[in-house]
A protein has these predicted regions:
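Short alpha-helical transmembrane segments in multi-pass integral membrane proteins
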Residues: 1-7, 14-26, 121-141, 147, ...
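Transmembrane alpha-helical segments of multi-pass transport proteins
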Residues: 45, 248-310
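Junctions where cytoplasmic loops transition into the N-terminal start of transmembrane alpha-helices
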Residues: 37, 41, 76-84, 117-133
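Alpha-helical transmembrane segments of multi-pass membrane transport and lipid-handling proteins
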Residues: 119-170, 203
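Helix-loop junctions and terminal segments of transmembrane helices
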Residues: 88-113
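Helix-terminus/linker motif at the lipid-water interface of multi-pass membrane proteins
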Residues: 46-87, 108, 148-152, 270-278
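Short runs within selected transmembrane alpha-helices of multi-pass transporters and secretion channels
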Residues: 1, 159-185, 189-209, 214-236, ...
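Residue-level signature of transmembrane alpha-helical cores of multipass secondary-active transporters
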Residues: 33-49, 82-85, 89, 129, ...
Length: 310
């Protein structure tokens, strides 16, 4: 009896040890999986911050090699990084918020093998980003560039904004596609694409800026955003045969942008003519530019909500 009792106790102890070992093994496995996906994201953020620090040093230094004085080189960098880019990145607050919501949705669909749901999410997110990007591009060219130059009292803000406006669709779509790839456990791939884009920007700083000035850096920004967005798209196309919808994602946003801008211009001219006897208004004033932007966005949203993109 004593021996049986001792054996039972030993068996219980062995079971506890095995359970503890299996729990520790599972914990180790979970930690490895989390690290596998978290490290590329952390590396991506780290490299981005390191590049921004290096960029603050490289741009003025390369502009001095180009022939600008020290003061003009620093001033040019300040105009690009402190005035132009914040204007371009302002609408990305919408896409960044959307990408935060996309990641868990795509991750859930991927875990239960709902490919059709992932494809639907892809279509909807790209459609929204293309509408936002093309409309933003039109507004930057027509109004926001002039508004920024007026507010900052710096005419070159307008020129730089016009040059960089074309990256808006690629920049916003890239954010959503990167979030979707992260949700599909492709964090290492998105990190590699980001490093590729950063390498192009660094190469443009080193190779182009000493020869053609700040335009070389702008060209590097444009090329890197287009290339990284294209790489994200190609990867998703290989996985889900995600085909571009040219009509809904390019032609329709462009048409709606033209309609919205034209309608707001006509409406503002009518309002200006009616109120001219009370308060003189000019189409180049800050009030007029802000009114055009707000009215164009309002008209665009109204039309967008009435159009069926399925």
């Amino acid at each position: 009896y004593v021996n049986n009792k001792q054996n039972n106790k030993n068996n219980k102890n062995n079971k506890i040890i095995r359970n503890n070992n299996s729990c520790s093994a599972r914990k180790t496995s979970y930690i490895r999986v989390i690290a596998l996906y978290a490290l590329p994201l952390n590396l991506n953020s780290l490299l981005l911050h390191l590049f921004e620090s290096a960029e603050a040093i490289l741009i003025p230094a390369q502009l001095i090699i180009y022939g600008l004085s020290k003061e003009n080189a620093v001033s040019t960098y300040g105009i690009i990084s402190g005035m132009t880019l914040p204007l371009l990145l302002f609408p990305s607050a919408i896409t960044n918020s959307m990408s935060v919501m996309l990641l868990p949705k795509v991750s859930e669909d991927n875990s239960v093998q709902r490919s059709s749901s992932v494809i639907t999410t892809l279509h909807q997110s790209v459609n929204i980003c293309m509408h936002l990007g093309i409309m933003s591009c039109v507004l930057f060219i027509l109004y926001i560039g002039r508004l920024g130059a007026t507010l900052f009292h710096e005419p070159s803000v307008y020129n730089y904004t016009i040059m960089l406006a074309c990256i808006c669709p690629f920049l916003y779509v890239r954010t959503s596609l990167a979030s979707i790839l992260n949700g599909l456990n492709m964090t290492a791939r998105t990190c590699a694409y980001s490093i590729t884009g950063l390498a192009i920007r660094i190469a443009s700083l080193i190779l182009l800026v000493p020869g053609i000035g700040i335009s070389g850096y702008i060209y590097g920004l444009i090329i890197s955003n287009i290339l990284v967005c294209t790489l994200h798209y190609i990867k998703l196309y290989k996985m889900y045969h995600f085909k571009p919808d040219i009509i809904n994602n390019i032609i329709t946003p462009l048409s709606l942008s033209i309609i919205a801008v034209t309608s707001s211009n006509i409406a503002l001219r009518l309002i200006t003519s009616l109120l001219s006897c009370v308060t003189p208004l000019t189409l180049n004033s800050i009030f007029s530019l802000c009114a055009n932007i707000l009215l164009s966005c309002l008209i665009y949203i109204i039309i967008y909500s009435k159009v069926d993109f399925t």
